[in-house]
Amino acid sequence: MVFAAWYLKFAFFVALAFSIIGGSMASSLVLPHASELKGVWQLSDKHQQCDVSLTDQPLPEGSIWSLNGDNDCLAYMFGEVPAGWRPTPDGLTITDEQGSGLAFFANEPDGWFARFADGRELMMKPNKTNKKNE
């Protein structure tokens, strides 16, 4: 009986701690608006680099924004030419025309990184010389 009472108290406090921690973590992430991230970004891997323009113009799908750039370079980087993007609380997702994700870029201190199962890594950085990003 003593063990059961102790176990129930322990389980209660663990559940309480996780609910407090989980609630504060979720509330600390903010979804940026497209206007905060729009502009020309530099996309690169180990072999190639190209400029990508993230716009705040919505695509017909409704929840993604238009993306423009050199189609040959974009097809090389993503395996197909992406059509759009959407912000997330911890990064941004490059999408096809229907909104399916092609790559997720996590916002890290040294840039925005997408890592793929085959070992490839892409990096995006805002182009600081572009007036849209200032």
Swiss-Prot record:
Cysteines paired by S-S bonds: 50-73
Extent of the signal sequence: 1-26
GO cellular component: periplasmic space
Localization, UniProt: Periplasm
Cell inner membrane in keyword set: no
Primary residence: periplasm
Keywords carried by this UniProt record: Disulfide bond, Metalloenzyme inhibitor, Metalloprotease inhibitor, Periplasm, Protease inhibitor, Signal
Pfam families for this protein: Inh (PF02974)
Keyword Signal: yes
InterPro entries assigned: Inh (IPR022815), Inh/Omp19 (IPR021140), Protease_inh_b-brl_dom (IPR016085)
GO MF assignments: metalloendopeptidase inhibitor activity
Function: Inhibitor of the alkaline protease.
Assigned protein family: Belongs to the protease inhibitor I38 family.
Designated name of the protein: Alkaline proteinase inhibitor
Organism field: Photorhabdus luminescens (Xenorhabdus luminescens)
Highest classification ranks of the organism: Bacteria, Pseudomonadati, Pseudomonadota, Gammaproteobacteria, Enterobacterales
